[in-house]
From Swiss-Prot:
The keyword Transmembrane does not apply. This is Repressor of RNA polymerase III transcription MAF1. Residues 69-84 have a biased composition (Polar residues). The lineage of its organism: Eukaryota, Fungi, Dikarya, Ascomycota, Saccharomycotina. It holds the Pfam family Maf1. The modification Phosphoserine is found at S90, S209, S210. Phosphorylated by PKA in a TORC1-dependent manner. Phosphorylation at PKA consensus sites RRxS/T decreases upon rapamycin treatment. One of its GO terms (biological process) is negative regulation of transcription by RNA polymerase III. One of its GO terms (molecular function) is RNA polymerase III core binding. It is found in: Cytoplasm; Nucleus. Present with 1720 molecules/cell in log phase SD medium. It comes from the Eukaryota. Keywords: Cytoplasm, Nucleus, Phosphoprotein, Repressor, Transcription, Transcription regulation. The modification Phosphothreonine is found at T347.
Amino acid sequence: MKFIDELDIERVNQTLNFETNDCKIVGSCDIFTTKAVASDRKLYKTIDQHLDTILQENENYNATLQQQLAAPETNQSPCSSPFYSNRRDSNSFWEQKRRISFSEYNSNNNTNNSNGNSSNNNNYSGPNGSSPATFPKSAKLNDQNLKELVSNYDSGSMSSSSLDSSSKNDERIRRRSSSSISSFKSGKSSNNNYSSGTATNNVNKRRKSSINERPSNLSLGPFGPINEPSSRKIFAYLIAILNASYPDHDFSSVEPTDFVKTSLKTFISKFENTLYSLGRQPEEWVWEVINSHMTLSDCVLFQYSPSNSFLEDEPGYLWNLIGFLYNRKRKRVAYLYLICSRLNSSTGEVEDALAKKPQGKLIIDDGSNEYEGEYDFTYDENVIDDKSDQEESLQ
């Protein structure tokens, strides 16, 4: 990529570089063309290989997930599981047992009723001297049984055929009730099985639909589908600009998800609000100059906001605001940023205070001259008298 050096862009860069009481702001707007050079082509190939590995890993993951979902469907379905089969068998077994016991109970009751009726007929007589009517034990009395009982009681006699018919009717009623209950239970269990089966089928369908999506739908962060060359090129352009701007840093770990696609209006308002917070008045001519070189209405803006910024290793680093303006028509990319760091004076304030403080002479006394006398030239015999020397010279 080729760097575009313009005089008005240099004026913008000078405006975006300033200092506050405790911070230093480094800002710039660097414009590059998307025409690739030899080093850029090598970088593009490396990025393509990296993205191909990501795509292959995603396809392998989807294939294994499809196999895991297909295995339980072929071997065992929800409705053919042993839980449901045992449940149906147990229901049918207990239902048959209940019917058998119920029929035995009815037969015993009928025999007991017949024996009791014969004994009662011999011991007790009705008001007309005839045997009274014995009422069969039944759960319910229908209209026909009630009429027969009333007529037989009034006449004082009851035929055995009426008793047999009433007992048969009672058995029919009981059978109908038991069959209706069993049919209701079987219908309820089948409905439960059907609902559970449909629920599992719906879940499997949703999983299959998410797995069977084409690899083209795999998004490359804010740049679009991962297998489209245009999406990969945009990502490669931004990495190439970062490499050119910061050659001492390694950007091999930068992922497409570290970038966020935002609107131009949102980024401009955030940029100007940052300048306001730093005590600087935003200049309209700055955006006019950038618009003359980039045509902002045709630009797509990507903001670089990773979880861990590469600038954190820099001394005194505080925060950054980084954006990339990409114009496909003009084949240009603008790198616009603000980086805030602490001033050097604030970091070394203690050292500066110590350097400015006046220091006295350092005297080292080890006690070696404690008993030595001081040199006093007044009482020294070897002192040369300057006056005597002068007089001798005059003579």
